Amino acid sequence: MRGILLAGGTGSRLWPVTRAISKQLIPVFDKPMIYYPLTTLMMAGVREILVITRPDDQRQFRHLLGDGSQLGLRLEYAVQERPEGIAQAFVLGAEFIGDQSVALVLGDNIFHGAGLGTRLRQYNDPAGARIFAYVVADPKAYGVVEFDEAGRAVSIEEKPARPKSRYAVPGLYFYDNRVLDVVHGLVPSRRGELEITAVNETYLKWGQLRVTTLDRGTAWLDTGTFASLVQASEYVRVVEERQGLKIGCVEEVAWRCGFIGNDQLRDLSRPLLKSGYGRYLLDLLADHEELKEVKPS
């Protein structure tokens, strides 16, 4: 499976903050926003990832992430000249996807929860499409999915006036390779965009749109407004300070997933020591070595 991280768009809901910088590069507490969706793909076992950016932003993303080799990844980049819908990501990424299945994550969506990576890895070779469902207070503001007890989608609507369920569809999607054919046949919506809901509707018609609920132990944070951005930062701060563990730490996730070894993690920590971020990485290694030295009684 290959991954696409969509970090384009104008970010106009966050202007003037995002007039000169990509939304996905602004901080969510102690990390750039893009670290969080990137680690979501990594936890799903995806190591080949296409990062789609605005033309003016690509240089900064390359400076931050490079080619991904330091994290055991292969990162490539594509430019979104104009934002023409979420499903445009598959048009821009068609050559990168090739004959593989693909996971798409939106660059302003943050997921966190115990066992999330284990669950995501179950779906990294989908037969059809896999979307996720999350209970929200106001489903009218989201894409809404209705599904049966077996996890088969029954209906899906974009911002319905009368929602058929309280389950919103977060910005994380898994598709088999037929998604490229689906997108090729899409007609732009009235707002001139290739809609991700239209992609999902096609799989629904085929009877191959599966739904996994994200339970109450999982947080889904959308950072598209000033208020939600502050809330996301506060959530990350509180969890990290109480648990002593970081959320969305790309170096830690690469290490825990086995993409890099101890020496690579140690090398990555050194330039980050002044902020305390590097000390956290070194402490992970120290704790790991301590556990290895403990002998069973």
Swiss-Prot record:
| E.C. code | 2.7.7.24
Pfam families, from UniProt?
NTP_transferase
Pathway(s) of this molecule: Antibiotic biosynthesis; novobiocin biosynthesis
Which GO biological process categories is it annotated with? antibiotic biosynthetic process
Return one GO MF term: metal ion binding
Q: Which Gene3D superfamilies match?
A: Spore Coat Polysaccharide Biosynthesis Protein SpsA, Chain A (3.90.550.10)
What keywords does the record list, in alphabetical order? Antibiotic biosynthesis, Magnesium, Metal-binding, Nucleotidyltransferase, Transferase
Positions annotated to bind Mg(2+):
108, 222
Write out the function statement from the record: Catalyzes the formation of dTDP-glucose, from dTTP and glucose 1-phosphate in the novobiocin biosynthesis pathway, an aminocoumarin family antibiotic that targets bacterial DNA gyrases.
Instruction: Please give the name of this protein.
Output: Glucose-1-phosphate thymidylyltransferase
Q: Which organism is it from?
A: Streptomyces niveus (Streptomyces spheroides)
Question: In the UniProt record, what gene is named as encoding this protein?
Answer: novV
